Amino acid sequence: MRDFLPVTRADCEKRGWKQPDFVYVIGDAYVDHPSFGPAIISRLLESHGFSVGIIPQPDWRDEKSIQVFGEPRLGFLVSSGNMDSMVNHYSVSKKRRETDLYSPGGEMGRRPDYAVVVYGNLIRRTYKHTPMIIGGIEASLRRLSHYDYWSNKVRRSILLDSGADLISYGMGERSIVAIAQALESGLAVEDITFLDGTVYKTRDRELLERNHARALPDFESVRASKQAYAESFYIQYQNTDHFTADTLYETYDKKLFVVQNRPAKPLLQEEMDRVYGLFYMRTYHPMYEAAGGVPAISEVKFSLISNRGCFGGCNFCALTFHQGRTVQTRSHASIVAEARLLTYEPDFKGYIHDVGGPTANFRHPSCEKQLEKGVCTGRQCLFPSPCKNLRADHRDYIALLKKLRELPGVKKVFIRSGIRFDYVLADDDETFLRELCAHHVSGQLKVAPEHISRAVLERLGKPAPEVYKEFVKRYTRMNERLGKEQYLVPYLMSSHPGATLKEAVELAEYLRDIHYTPKQVQDFYPTPSTISTCMYYTGLDPRDMSAVYTAVNPHEKAMQRALMQFNNPKNYDLVYEALTKAGRTDLIGFDKKCLIRPRAGRGKSGGNKGIAFGGNATSGTYLRGSAGQKMQRRETGPKRKKKTIRNIHKKK
């Protein structure tokens, strides 16, 4: 039946089901689109002959809300949805967000905090012995003990707190089908201890010995000692590749073990094609029409997923823990076939919004050996500089983009999911840069240097500042050749571990020199299972156990943010304080290099009058890629003649 999967018992009856094999409880609204993890998992199970009922966003205060289908034949599946529920709910300053793009009408409050734990306990109150498997981003990144930024404490494995039997972690296609088949065969869920890509709990120490499992520091140790936490985290980080990973276990109360089997094997291209070639309705369930639909679909409805996995190795990113470092791709035929489907949509205007993934311009593993031996342990492909074995080649991606541009009904194909500029520079052939600027930039290209300080970039795992500056030159030069006026928009981050006020001032000076003011400033967000979050919590870099300064005081973080928008009058007092504390009062004055003027008077109201900045700045964009590199500048400072009150009110 080509329709949405059942969301009510009546839907099941239409299909002739007495009870579904699985009931899938999710924190998002039900969107049947391959950009949504629950859609992929449910459709994949369906393709293997299993029936799945969906309970989207149940009322966690009412036990009846998860009894819609009764007890499933094989088990419950639980996911928070496409995002960690805490990231979904709170900004980095821990303020409640006003909207939830994954809920009907963008309404906030339709899922609980720590959704997987809450849903799991809700299920367990009614179905005490029914198998329960949790998965998705929230469960995957909390699979072992982890620092939780929102409660500011180390929490246990989510497997224990949720009451679940298994975690299907990472990209769960292989493990969820294997779990379903094991349950179908009659195997008890507590005996499913042998599958890659899963986490289970046991009291059987002999099982650990038979599987040659490697012990992590126990939970009490990592909770009590930040050094033990950093050591444990880095062992986990080094065991995220299917080919090289050990089985790991963590001890709780001396007799209970949470065991992480090695990650699932990356999907082959034909397997990726099958997953994305499954039948999807490609939109939200019609029950949400009255609320105005689900806003998140608008960002992905006319986008194409080309790849998964990333060998970029950014320390603030959890992709290594979730998708792994081995890039997996779909075939051209699969992607072109999906693009043709888009052209038949009634609201398709001819524009494909994105063709990419975690990193758009990664279309193959970084080197040949990864497919047989996995990624290197203890080494990165691009950081601190590209590995000599790196295969920097954009020819496949160029050919794919050309095929998409030539499809009937397609006017333009954009790239929005981000490119690695250091990988572009590593490719000796400039064809991709030319094609990118000529065909695939929608007025501005977003890139992510993140910072300009060498010390901070080292902690970020990002390339040195001169690499980004070289890309700016080449991008500008290419646009000049093409006669294009196109912007570069850099993503920048404040308060990342390693950034003191000194480095924040260095970034402000760079922004002054390139005449750029970010419209929005992103503070570092300590989310579970990243190296940067480990640094934030422990004050240690787990790679070498060196001490790392981290701004945790909200006022200092506010100063670092303000320095990135030093020309905003509202930020004057914070910028003044930051420059004073950093010993950089030389940047307070009337010279063109100064960030602000001296105080015009005492107090906040007088301080705001003193705003000035060197060279003026554009807001939100910089660097037109046209001849002359014309800058849009806002006239400010003493050159501007003040009108008298009489002039302001003068009648024409």
Predicted regions: what they are:
Residues M1-Q19, A29, E231-S303:
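N-terminal [4Fe-4S]-dependent radical SAM core
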Residues A10, G37, P56-D253, Q260-N261:
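Glycine-rich beta-alpha loop elements in corrinoid/cobalamin-binding modules
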Residues Y24-I26, I55, D59-W60, L341-V489, ...:
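Conserved SAM/AdoMet-binding glycine-rich loop
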Residues V25-Y30, A291-A318, V336, T343, ...:
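N-terminal pre-triad scaffold of radical SAM enzymes
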Residues R61, E190-D241, K255-L256, A264-L267, ...:
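Terminal amphipathic helices with adjacent charged low-complexity linkers/tails
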Residues D84-S93, L141-R143, E173-A178, T202-L207, ...:
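Flexible glycine/acidic-rich beta-alpha junction loops that bind and position SAM and/or redox cofactors
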Residues D165, V275, C310, I335, ...:
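Conserved, mostly hydrophobic/aromatic
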Residues K373, R379, L595-K652:
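Acidic, low-complexity intrinsically disordered tails
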